[in-house]
Amino acid sequence: MKFSKFHSLGNDFLVVDLDEVAETGDFKGLAQEICERHTGVGADGLLVISVKDPGRGEATFRIFNADGSEAEISGNGIRCAAAYLFSQQRVEGRTVRFATASGERECDFIERVQNRYTIRIDLGAPRLSSQDIPFDDGQVRERIIDYPLTINKKVYPVTVVSMGNPHCAVFVDRFPNRIDWLATGAEIESHPFFPNRTNVEFIRVHNREEIEVLFWERGVGETMSSGSGSTAAAVASILKGLTDRKVRVKTSMGPLLVEWEGDTVRQTGPAEFVFVGSFLLK
């Protein structure tokens, strides 16, 4: 099976184009096998895409985490999938529209420098109600801002949003040590109030235009960056009145730009080609 590897700020993915390989059917098992970093190729996730209309730039997108679970959406994953299609000239024009489990997402090609593509994604409107996220503490809530979530007898004021997938934002004055925040991220991910589990972001606000984020990704664990996580962190910062509506998000591998205008949140960032390869299916 042929694949291409891309990454966006260290968040790495293996792209499988269904128009070039025979569909395996068991993508969950394949993701677990191929994403394993010691016995497989190694990646945070597997992207399965197919072009439906090259002239209109229409394609389908599915993402499977390294643990085999299927996610609704991934900002960095969408960007990597778009970079693949642009690099292979699989679509005409400078825009690709992906049909995802969370609805249509539009990606615009901005520029290319060698193997690095800059792409802007329209992620639509954030979902803020407890039913839409989903978040279930037994009450219906229009917004979840500074909710007192108890983890191991410690209360964390969290802000919860969905960018097509659930995110729990934890604001800190300084980042906890790595062992502590990884343990907390794992506990929050599987908290019973999140019926579909959740992604977790630990956020430091530098000023009204910049935040810094650490990421715990559902089904993966620690990641160097996260597109939807960066967007959710920016949205949470805006909801709390801590930043303006145009936010630079610092990750451990570089920045992403998030802009919230009206009902639309857009994110601009890089996606970089790494290599192509083939994987022997068992």
Regions found by a protein language model. Name each.
Residues P157-V158, P166-A169:
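Selected transmembrane alpha-helices and immediately adjacent juxtamembrane segments
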Residues V161-M163, N177:
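Membrane-interfacial helix-loop segments of redox and metal-homeostasis proteins
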